[in-house]
Amino acid sequence: MELSDALANKRKDILSLWIERTLDSYTSSGFFKRSKDPFANPVGVSIATGLTALFDLLLANADQSAFLEPLDTVVRIRAVQEFTPSQALASFLELKWVVLQFFSGSKETRPILPMLDDLDCRIDRMALTAFDIYAACREQLYQNRVSELKSGRAILTDAACPSALMRQERRETGTSN
């Protein structure tokens, strides 16, 4: 049995576990897993769609440039959220673990394990490309923030309401007026 055939046979199971583990990194993972409506759940649907496309590209042994669009979709979402870089990108490398779980447990697929080195290398390249995209997204966020600070708009968006500041000051000093 060839590796590509084994991956194709286990495609649905591998994708299901990979998407589940990725969505588990969110505090609202239950909602992300249940709702398939792209309008009610754009994050969950976009991540599932992106990971599915990435897996299919790995199966097709596609050129690295073909990975850019689905990687960009997933990484942009995770780059603007409160994840550390390692948390944001760990799901790409977890695919290795997911594949190993399905192939190491079956006697018929155990002979394929030595063939996983090539797949692991392609997954590593995919993860490195994801890191490049993540770094570019974070840099863009910081550049936007600096531009906002320079323009003075940050004063409007980050400043507390004057009446809220007065209430806080009263609480701290213990005065009622």
What does each of the following model-derived ranges do?
Residues 86-101:
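Elongated alpha-helical scaffolds
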Residues 1-71, 107-177:
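Core of compact, soluble alpha-helical bundle domains
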Residues 67-78, 100-104:
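Short, charged/polar, low-complexity loop and linker segments
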Residues 81-82:
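Cytosolic, long alpha-helical scaffolding segments
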Residues 74, 91-95, 127:
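Long, contiguous hydrophobic alpha-helical segments, chiefly transmembrane helices and signal peptides
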